[in-house]
C-alpha cells in the first residue's frame, strides 16, 4: 500500500469514528487552497529547512477553528516529513468520503456556460447511468472544445466535445492515408 493510501485511510478511519468526514474534508480543501494561493506559505510548509517545531506552531495557528483531527493529521505529516504528499492524500481522502456517502463528483467542461436547468438535466442523467448515486457537478467553460462536453469522474474521461470528435476523425483519416 502506498504512503498516500496509508495516510488517507488512517485519516478516514479517525474522521468516520468521530463523525467528521465532511468537516475534515472541508478543512483539508481549505488548507490546500491556502497553500496554492500563497507561495510564501507553500515554501514554508513544504520547506525542508524549516524546523519541525516552527511548522507545528504554524499549523496550530493556520488551523484554528478547524477540526482537531485536521490539525493533528497535518502535524503528523510534518513530523514524518511527508508534507509533499498532502495534495495526493486529499484527493484519495475525497474519493473515500464520496464513496462512503454514495456521492460522485463529476467535472463537466463545456464551450459555453450551462444554465441551471441544463446542469440539473445532466446531473439526473449521470445519476441514472451511475446507478442512482448523488452527483456533485463541477462545471467549467473552455471555448476551445467548440461544443459538446467533456466529463471527468474518478479516473475516467468521456470526451463528447466537437473538438474531440474532430481530432478522432483526423486521426482516423491519417491512419487510412486519406490526408
UniProtKB/Swiss-Prot annotation:
<keyword id="KW-0375">Hydrogen ion transport</keyword>
<dbReference type="GO" id="GO:0005886">
    <property type="term" value="C:plasma membrane"/>
</dbReference>
<keyword id="KW-0139">CF(1)</keyword>
<comment type="function">
    <text>F(1)F(0) ATP synthase produces ATP from ADP in the presence of a proton or sodium gradient. F-type ATPases consist of two structural domains, F(1) containing the extramembraneous catalytic core and F(0) containing the membrane proton channel, linked together by a central stalk and a peripheral stalk. During catalysis, ATP synthesis in the catalytic domain of F(1) is coupled via a rotary mechanism of the central stalk subunits to proton translocation.</text>
</comment>
<protein>
    <recommendedName>
        <fullName>ATP synthase subunit delta</fullName>
    </recommendedName>
</protein>
<comment type="subunit">
    <text>F-type ATPases have 2 components, F(1) - the catalytic core - and F(0) - the membrane proton channel. F(1) has five subunits: alpha(3), beta(3), gamma(1), delta(1), epsilon(1). F(0) has three main subunits: a(1), b(2) and c(10-14). The alpha and beta chains form an alternating ring which encloses part of the gamma chain. F(1) is attached to F(0) by a central stalk formed by the gamma and epsilon chains, while a peripheral stalk is formed by the delta and b chains.</text>
</comment>
<keyword id="KW-0472">Membrane</keyword>
<comment type="similarity">
    <text>Belongs to the ATPase delta chain family.</text>
</comment>
<keyword id="KW-0066">ATP synthesis</keyword>
<dbReference type="InterPro" id="IPR000711">
    <property type="entry name" value="ATPase_OSCP/dsu"/>
</dbReference>
<dbReference type="GO" id="GO:0046933">
    <property type="term" value="F:proton-transporting ATP synthase activity, rotational mechanism"/>
</dbReference>
<dbReference type="GO" id="GO:0045259">
    <property type="term" value="C:proton-transporting ATP synthase complex"/>
</dbReference>
<dbReference type="InterPro" id="IPR026015">
    <property type="entry name" value="ATP_synth_OSCP/delta_N_sf"/>
</dbReference>
<keyword id="KW-0406">Ion transport</keyword>
<keyword id="KW-1003">Cell membrane</keyword>
<comment type="function">
    <text>This protein is part of the stalk that links CF(0) to CF(1). It either transmits conformational changes from CF(0) to CF(1) or is implicated in proton conduction.</text>
</comment>
<keyword id="KW-0813">Transport</keyword>
<dbReference type="Pfam" id="PF00213">
    <property type="entry name" value="OSCP"/>
</dbReference>
